[in-house]
Amino acid sequence: MKTAIVTSKSSLNHNTGSGHPESISRVTSILEKLKKNKKLIWKNPTSFDKDIIKQAHSSSYLDAVENAFPEKGLVFLDGDTVVSPGSKDATFDAVGSIISAIDGVENK
């Protein structure tokens, strides 16, 4: 069985501030360790039409998410979720990563 890692550089722009479990330093450390495993396949997120997201979420929810990202600084969406200006691209690349992973399993 082959294992793929689907990621993009945008994940390094999802700044959640110091002390948060999704910190950039933690993501960087994990990626560096994974890169030592030569058996892994590295893939980029798939580009997608936002209508795909609307199959699972309402247009109003998608609009709320898109408008939640600050131009500067950090914003808490709830007690656990922190976003920064770089989080928007990271969020949509995460969706593309899921699509790419599913396509990989389905051998597309």
Regions found by a protein language model. Give the residues of each.
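HDAC/HDAC-like amidohydrolase catalytic core signature
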Residues: M1-K108
